[in-house]
Design a protein with these regions (language model features):
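Sec-dependent N-terminal signal peptides
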Residues: 3-11
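Short, solvent-exposed helix-to-loop capping segments enriched in aromatics
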Residues: 29, 106-120
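Short beta-strands and strand-coil junctions in structured, solvent-facing domains, enriched
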Residues: 45-46, 67, 74-77, 87, ...
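An acidic-aromatic
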Residues: 57-108, 179-180
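Gly/Pro-enriched, hydrophobic low-complexity segments
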Residues: 96, 118-211
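A generic structural motif
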Residues: 40-44, 69-71, 88-90, 144-146, ...
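N-terminal leader/targeting segments and the immediate start of mature chains
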Residues: 10-54, 201-214
């Protein structure tokens, strides 16, 4: 707790540099064991050439467990039990499963939230303007992965500078598509159970195993 108060006082006394904010954010999330939040996800541009807005509920438990439950406009479910990841869209009647990468290979934004990877080790940080639609008073930290990623070119974390809570997440992929997540009703260290991240493959669906990425 002493380090957290010291970091907070330092950041309140002057505008933090990008490395200082990244380090403080990493230390904050090292103390968070689980959390939940409502989310709004907007995707625009890229291969779809249109804007889509979806909503749902996110729950995460370290290390590596997460559940993205999309509820509108279409039901979708993305689950990681810490060892395997599952993607399920009921309308498609298909489950895609893959293994969770090791910590030193996990720079996917969602996996950082789940305690995989490390901001100061895996990314180069810089401060940028606050993305449109994000909460006023937040700080925007742009993170460029030091190792090239297939899913995205860079990401922006939107952070509450007083609490270091993540209010939003923006990623841009190689096709120019932008995914923006905004988080509300965030609750931390509530004692989520492992069973909340178990996934049972529904009957009558096709199961596809995704190949490991090189």
């Amino acid at each position: 707790m002493i380090w957290f108060l010291a970091a907070l006082l330092a950041l309140m006394s002057a505008d933090p540099t990008a490395p200082e904010l990244a380090q403080a954010l990493q230390k904050k999330y090292d103390t968070v064991k689980d959390f939940s939040a409502d989310f709004t996800h907007t995707y625009e541009g890229g291969v779809l050439r249109k804007q889509i807005t979806e909503r749902g509920r996110l729950t995460i438990k370290k290390p590596g467990k997460m559940r993205w439950q999309y509820t509108a406009p279409e039901e979708k479910l993305f689950v990681s039990d810490g060892a395997m990841m599952y993607s399920y869209i009921p309308q498609d009647k298909q489950v895609i499963r893959s293994t969770v990468p090791p910590d030193d290979e996990a720079t996917t934004p969602a996996l950082f939230l789940a305690g995989k990877g490390n901001l100061t080790r895996d990314f180069t940080a810089s401060l940028v303007e606050l993305p449109a639609g994000m909460a006023a008073g937040s700080k925007a930290l742009k993170l460029v992965p030091k190792t090239r990623q297939q899913d995205y070119d860079w990401l922006v974390l939107v952070v509450d500078p007083a609490t270091f809570e993540i209010r939003g997440l923006v990623t841009v992929d190689a096709q120019g598509g932008k995914s923006s997540f905004s988080f509300t009703n965030l609750k931390q260290n509530v004692g989520l159970a492992d069973k909340d991240f178990a996934f049972k493959i529904p009957r009558g669906v096709d199961v596809v195993s995704a190949s490991p990425r090189s």
